From Swiss-Prot:
InterPro entries: IsoCit/isopropylmalate_DH_CS, Isocitrate_DH_NADP, IsoPropMal-DH-like_dom. NADP(+) binds at residues 78-80, 85, 262, 312-317, 330. Pfam families: Iso_dh (PF00180). It catalyses: D-threo-isocitrate + NADP(+) = 2-oxoglutarate + CO2 + NADPH. It comes from Candida tropicalis. This is Isocitrate dehydrogenase [NADP] peroxisomal. Substrate binds at residues 80, 97-103, 112, 135. The record marks 142, 214 as: Critical for catalysis. Mn(2+) binds at residues 254, 277. It is found in: Peroxisome. Its cofactor is Mg(2+); Mn(2+). Signal peptide: none annotated. Its EC number is 1.1.1.42. The gene is IDP2.
Amino acid sequence: MGEIQKITVKNPIVEMDGDEMTRIIWQFIKDKLILPYLNVDLKYYDLGIEYRDKTDDKVTTDAAEAILQYGVGVKCATITPDEARVKEFNLKKMWLSPNGTLRNVIGGTVFREPIVIDNIPRIVPSWEKPIIIGRHAFGDQYKATDVVIPAAGDLKLVFKPKDGGEVQEFPVYQFDGPGVALSMYNTDASITDFAESSFQLAIERKLNLFSSTKNTILKKYDGKFKDIFEGLYASKYKTKMDELGIWYEHRLIDDMVAQMLKSKGGYIIAMKNYDGDVQSDIVAQGFGSLGLMTSVLVTPDGKAFESEAAHGTVTRHYRQHQQGKETSTNSIASIYAWTRGLIQRGKLDDTPEVVKFAEELEKAVIETVSKDNIMTKDLALTQGKTDRSSYVTTEEFIDGVANRLNKNLGY
């Protein structure tokens, strides 16, 4: 084995550590798959629950500001505390989701993409190529005002212009008795950012782009999404997409999900907040596993980018680890959190050797499973295998990836 020639990463990467089993995996990945091959300045932020509590969650906003400063961040999975976690860690308060905090500071769109491995059976067998779900992570149900209507009466929506113009009233419903009501919103600026990010990813990945709404029912609300996407396509992106042989199309959400099931994959769907939330999990499971899903947050100007695994901290395995028992935890999505960040860093820095290394690492991950038949328990189970010899431990899998990477790189 020849000596490893380290590649230098020109600019820093923001590294955000996490919790429980994923924190252990994160360290293995860094020690075995990143640092032996790269000279990289990692700006380290500990987003583990104890340190977030110690800093009153300031560490999370500091990490977000650092991503805005340096352009690229990679994040380990983190605990979002509930009542039980507050008690378990004796927390000062129930801190917000770190992902939510990062999104609020950075802005941008969340794109979730499945990792496709040939020998992992798919629940939807026709899906050969990835389906990327772009989720508009602003407004709608997630920032709505929902109320319980106590008795009969009139419900109205009132708009009061800031410039002192005429107040507008919109009758909503005449209640004969108790019920519920909901008022939600979105903004042209946020929808435009969402559309820009979606078109840019389509061009970068050379994939067709769909957007989906229910504009036949919500003619003005969903119509606004449709109009903004179509306006940008015509004025800014159609020529470039034509050159690449790709296109954009709006589809009704019900038609879109039906077409999705019949298709072979290989496209992007830009979805409203709720639709994207639901469909990204359906897509992940359809491709075989929630453990095979990448998640990136990207701003429309491309200046801020954050990648992470689209799963939690794997508490159940961590409890086994704490008891000294062996674990077989899937680290693939966490490895991809690093590789997607490195690819973005390499593109921004114009260092193709960094991009090439990250792509080689992704290839090594896939081949460890598909060629070497080395996999964790969850992947073995998808093949109907339950015997102990069919899977390896958490650390053995990462060692397997390192061996495959060295073989492919000629070390």
